[in-house]
């Protein structure tokens, strides 16, 4: 096999890894405390052409971080606090590698920043929902994306050695923004006063010592002699706020099994078949034939083979591969296959056992995977036909779609279904359930939908409740769907990306929507501007000894 949907295999990014393959991170556990140590291999870049100096990172480093976090969640339920620190002297992390950014295409930079944002959002997600706390032990200079990683943690402790500082130097040094949530977390999360934030984000040297604490940029500054002892004490204190189980046995995350061929990516419960000429992919999620685990003990015994977790891992991998490796595949056709009642029964099992640590972590995996769909810059059409199983958890996929078409078949039964999972278990990045977001939290339509929880609904019933966009009959189905797909595929992908991002998240703002919808949007615009990436732009000239030449006109 030479290519997947015209994409050379050698150019494909693989998001699967495991600790034995790590080149940059190490994970150690000691009872309720885990330590993630960043010690980057300078020659271990995911692409050639740059060295990862000063503990700077690229996509490959973050793929390892994402994997390590998953292993803490599932393999180490006894861990309550994760200490994030550096294995290099006097440097915590200097952020994204500047030379990598300078060499990268616009699309690579955008996808890189999106994935790193999702990984840091996932840190906060685990703290909020799973009781897994994070402590940034900044044992050296903490700059740019390094500080953004620290910002995602529950607490930040900076060593007071008269040299180490925290900084966001992107504006003065590179002519770009801190693109992994830095600006937003400084204001929304750390509550740094605006004038202090303005100074902090426009000086390259950063802020150190007591001033960093006074400005709320860190929680503590500690002398080097007391640093290790202080970190241990704070890690234990954070652990006391967690309810993760001390005696639970973890579930080993084995390598995800899949087949890759010229048509796409194929898993046991997920399939992504690409139509390269039509620039579309059919993304299908399959339900199991029956419910095979009902109690917490039975669920834990199944481990990674428990359908909700296995399906979520497969879907997550498919999404990441499509987003990174197939930029021109702009329309995702979302389908399901299976018995809708089986999905509702599995949801009932999830709901009954949601206090179990493993079920809770699986819910978290599903929540983050579904959120990944929401923020993907692709058009999403759900196609609901007889034999599909858009019910409960899988109905969330249809609710994430920009449009949903449901065949009103004359003979075959075609249904969608609602479960407890549809009413707050899987909030979007704006904090709302997809039902609440769909109806702008209006009480009457939300109540009408909630009254049908546990029911399987016909096309007419789904249409009346506002759960689907259209219900063509047998005569019109093929033509209406074909026209909708062809019309969408003919529109400007840039305009569609902006359109979809504006329409999907409704009137409610959160820190995460501001990161994706404001910070990322401005960063992506700046990434295209000559002041950053032109021949004389700051990002292009970084490290050359030459001074950037700016176009001084404000736009």
UniProtKB/Swiss-Prot annotation:
SUPFAM superfamilies: ClpP/crotonase (SSF52096)
Organism lineage string: Bacteria, Pseudomonadati, Pseudomonadota, Betaproteobacteria, Rhodocyclales
GO BP: fatty acid beta-oxidation
Catalytic activity, as annotated: 2,3-epoxy-2,3-dihydrobenzoyl-CoA + 2 H2O = (3Z)-6-oxohex-3-enoyl-CoA + formate + H(+)
Family to which this protein belongs: Belongs to the benzoyl-CoA oxygenase component C family.
Enzyme Commission code(s) on record: 4.1.2.44
Known partners and oligomeric status: Homodimer.
Protein name according to UniProt: Benzoyl-CoA-dihydrodiol lyase
pH effect on activity, per entry: Optimum pH is 9.
Record's note on what induces expression: By benzoate.
Biological role: Catalyzes the ring opening of 2,3-epoxy-2,3-dihydroxybenzoyl-CoA to form 3,4-didehydroadipyl-CoA semialdehyde.
GO molecular function terms listed in the Swiss-Prot or TrEMBL record: lyase activity
Annotated Gene3D superfamilies: 2-enoyl-CoA Hydratase, Chain A, domain 1 (3.90.226.10)
Residues of the signal peptide: none
Alphabetical keyword list: Aromatic hydrocarbons catabolism, Lyase
